[in-house]
């Protein structure tokens, strides 16, 4: 080994950064590049290569570097030095940009000497200087502010006063003539001016094709033929031409023997029909003066095709029909007309896409597909009489026997004797009934007094008066209706004869019944009830004293008596939160 490992260790070895820069083992930062002293590092590398470095321990040989290591260290020094130069150039460029931006800034603060000329005049100071009357004899009482002159603006004064710099032309130095004594040595890095000079791109040239012919231009007749697609005359003409072409094809095998003597004639007609050579046709006609034409061809002497040679396809108004015999014998000489694009037609698989009306009606008349809707015939007897409905409440077998017995008992029609009015009673029976009513009234009064006393003695029960109970019971008895509804009476009376008329009785005057006065609840009864509740329970509230389902009048009466007892300091009524329970506690004067 020609070097020690501690030389290349990172952060400790003297060649660690150079070794990493040469081998690119890891990424280096700017601080590591700038920490390398290039001059000192080069001297140390030279000392190691020339074996001038002392051994770290006495007695050991001097450290040496191999050729590979010395080459790698030299490459590393070059890369570190190049990166340091890059950092230096970037810093200089950054500083120059800052200086340039600082020079471009315009001074916006005005100097104190320029402020008075740019501000409005102080009227108070002018009045003091002019003794309160600036030129009073000439009628001038104020001084208008003057606008500042552009030459007084400090920002652009130096720009207006400075002269425009002239453009200096660079003098071209004469080219130095090469010394003939010195041989021409062209460096490998220098290229010739022809190589580095930009040249214009050559235009793309189209290759010429031999035998290429330009297509004839579309004439006016062709355009009219293409535009007039909906014209019926053109369609008919095309059909006629199609028929003529079919006839020509059929007549070709018959006329093969006659085509040989007409070869020259066909060549002349072809040249006559081609657009660019009208003169050749005349030359051919003059060169063959003694040619004998058949009688069919001599008929074409009256037709002048020279007027149609200027266009490829002649217009429609100048087109003259040729004799049928010539067209039959010269099928290949006529120029094929451009095919007209037909409109795209929809193809249907079925020839008849819609059924005819007669066939449709015929299919509707057949009864194999359209049957009449069968009308459901109801049974002959669907409705039941009211008597049958009253006798049978529901379907048989649905009601249990107990309910069915009650229904049959209530559904019985009353007898006739019960429905008749009671006969005229005698005076004795009336007096007996009055005596019985008085006895019953006395008994009810005695019972009501007893119930009031019992309620006072037993206040733990609900605070409801016996009279109220008796009245409610009487109202319930009055509100009860008879088990037999009046409709049944009407149904039962329909089928029976009317009862005989009874004599009218004189109306008796109604005696109003005076209800006994209801005894009001006293505070002593409320106090007893509260005392009994407090003995049973430690805490007592208003809801336990008066049940929630008690009458409103009773609740208001008890609440009023509680307020009276609280004012007398016998009871204390408290409510801790709104809408909370009313707590009832004994007061200071509670017995």
UniProtKB/Swiss-Prot annotation:
The keyword Methyltransferase does not apply. The modification Phosphoserine is found at residues 149, 192. The gene is Rec8. Interacts (phosphorylated and unphosphorylated form) with SMC3. Interacts with SYCP3. Interacts (phosphorylated and unphosphorylated form) with SMC1B. Does not interact with SMC1A. Interacts with RAD51. Forms a complex with EWSR1, PRDM9, SYCP3 and SYCP1; complex formation is dependent of phosphorylated form of REC8 and requires PRDM9 bound to hotspot DNA; EWSR1 joins PRDM9 with the chromosomal axis through REC8. GO terms for cellular component: condensed chromosome; condensed chromosome, centromeric region; condensed nuclear chromosome; kinetochore; lateral element; male germ cell nucleus; meiotic cohesin complex; nucleoplasm. InterPro entries: Rad21/Rec8-like, Rad21/Rec8_C_eu, Rad21_Rec8_N, ScpA-like_C, WH_DNA-bd_sf. Belongs to the rad21 family. The keyword Phosphoprotein applies. This is Meiotic recombination protein REC8 homolog. Keywords: Centromere, Chromosome, Chromosome partition, Meiosis, Nucleus, Phosphoprotein. Required during meiosis for separation of sister chromatids and homologous chromosomes. Proteolytic cleavage of REC8 on chromosome arms by separin during anaphase I allows for homologous chromosome separation in meiosis I and cleavage of REC8 on centromeres during anaphase II allows for sister chromatid separation in meiosis II. It comes from Mus musculus.
């Amino acid at each position: 080994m020609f070097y020690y490992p501690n030389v290349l260790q990172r952060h400790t070895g003297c060649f660690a950064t150079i070794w990493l820069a040469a081998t690119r083992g890891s990424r280096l930062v700017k601080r590591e590049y700038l920490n390398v002293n290039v001059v000192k590092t080069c001297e140390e590398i030279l000392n190691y290569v020339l074996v001038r470095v002392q051994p770290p321990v006495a007695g050991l040989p001097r450290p040496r570097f191999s050729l590979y290591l010395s080459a790698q260290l030299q490459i590393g020094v070059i890369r570190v030095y190049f990166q340091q130069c890059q950092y230096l150039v970037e810093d200089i460029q950054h500083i120059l940009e800052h200086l340039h931006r600082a020079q471009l800034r315009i001074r916006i603060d005005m100097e104190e000497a320029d402020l008075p000329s740019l501000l409005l005049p102080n009227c108070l100071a002018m009045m003091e200087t002019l003794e309160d009357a600036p030129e009073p004899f000439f009628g001038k009482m104020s001084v208008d502010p003057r606008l500042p002159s552009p030459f007084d603006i400090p920002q652009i004064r130096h720009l207006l006063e400075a002269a425009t710099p002239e453009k200096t032309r660079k003098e071209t130095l004469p080219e130095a003539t090469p010394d003939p004594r010195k041989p021409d040595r062209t460096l490998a890095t220098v290229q010739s001016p022809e190589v580095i000079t930009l040249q214009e791109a050559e235009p793309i040239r189209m290759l010429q094709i031999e035998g290429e012919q330009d297509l004839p231009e579309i004439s006016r007749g062709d355009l009219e033929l293409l535009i007039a697609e909906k014209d019926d005359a053109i369609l008919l003409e095309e059909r006629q031409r199609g028929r003529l072409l079919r006839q020509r094809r059929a007549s070709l095998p018959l006329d093969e023997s006659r085509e040989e003597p007409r070869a020259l004639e066909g060549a002349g007609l072809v040249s006559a029909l081609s657009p660019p050579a009208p003169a050749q046709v005349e030359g051919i006609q003059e060169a063959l003066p003694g040619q004998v034409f058949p009688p069919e061809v001599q008929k074409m002497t009256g037709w002048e095709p020279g007027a149609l040679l200027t266009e490829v396809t002649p217009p429609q108004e100048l087109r003259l029909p040729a004799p049928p015999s010539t067209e039959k014998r010269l099928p290949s000489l006529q120029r094929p007309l451009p095919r007209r694009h037909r409109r795209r037609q929809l193809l249907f698989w079925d020839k008849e896409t819609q059924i005819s009306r007669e066939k449709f009606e015929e299919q509707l008349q057949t009864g194999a597909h359209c049957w009449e809707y069968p009308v459901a015939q109801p049974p002959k007897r669907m409705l039941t009489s009211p008597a049958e409905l009253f006798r049978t409440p529901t379907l048989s077998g649905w009601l249990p026997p107990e309910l069915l017995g009650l229904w049959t008992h209530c559904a019985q029609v009353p007898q006739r004797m019960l429905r008749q009015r009671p006969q005229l009673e005698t005076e004795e029976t009336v007096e007996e009934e009055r005596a019985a009513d008085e006895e019953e009234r006395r008994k009810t009064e005695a019972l009501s007094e007893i119930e009031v006393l019992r309620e006072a003695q037993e206040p733990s029960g609900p605070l409801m008066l016996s009279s109220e109970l008796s009245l409610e019971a009487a109202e319930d008895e009055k509100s009860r209706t008879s088990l037999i509804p009046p409709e049944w009476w009407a149904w039962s009376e329909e089928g029976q004869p009317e009862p005989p008329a009874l004599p009218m009785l004189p109306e008796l005057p109604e005696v109003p019944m005076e209800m006994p006065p209801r005894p009001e609840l006293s505070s002593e009864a409320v106090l007893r009830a509260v005392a009994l509740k407090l003995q049973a329970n430690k805490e007592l509230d208003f809801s336990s004293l008066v049940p929630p389902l008690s009458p409103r009048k009773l609740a208001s009466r008890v609440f009023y008596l509680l307020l009276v007892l609280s004012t007398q300091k016998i009871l204390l009524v408290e409510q801790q939160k709104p809408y909370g329970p009313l707590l009832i506690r004994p007061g200071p004067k509670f017995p």
